[in-house]
């Protein structure tokens, strides 16, 4: 038992050492941790209520308001922290929904094959045949605008890629000796799926899921920018950007947060995939 733990720790240490050699991945991880930490601690570190009018209209950055105020006098730093919180919440929850649905359907299609594989994959192909942004916009227009609507829409639109990835892995894994041995021993199909096959498919799924999370955060911001997502006075990176379309405001305010939040997972993903 101790030897197994030692081997596990050695493998984890080797993974961490390889990750640390990738400087861009470390930098992206640091940025992501900073943004996530600020978002999670927003109720503690935000100086003002993000929806309260606390100062003059359009005040420049200063000692009292570090990032200034918006057009109606709300503190920009507080709104930025809560907006990042909203984007992270939407991204994580939508990714969990998409991953759970995609993994489940991919396992069923890959392991059982036959009619189940045909039905699931043809439905997957049908969903993927629609232009992604058009499908999201149509769904967002049908349902009432709001954070939960966007989370559910993105969660139920982003699963096909994960399903195809899992199915491909399952098709190769079901021919391996350990799966054949479990089948010969009379193990139930769902035990084999979730105890033998699923753990061996999680590495590529996790890498893919982090990319999906970045895309869902960007999609949430885009829909909020168009007025189909988070509604004012609630703070979102999208509706904050919509209210700051003048070039003067864009050059003075830290809107690069949305770019950092979207791009920081990518170098980390490439490092993990190695």
Predicted regions and their residues:
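Conserved small/polar residues in nucleotide/adenosyl-binding loops
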Residues: 262-269
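Hydrophobic alpha-helical transmembrane segments of membrane transport/permease proteins
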Residues: 38-72, 225-235
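Transmembrane alpha-helices
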Residues: 85-101, 190-222
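Short, membrane-interfacial amphipathic segments enriched in basic
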Residues: 1-13, 64-70, 74, 190
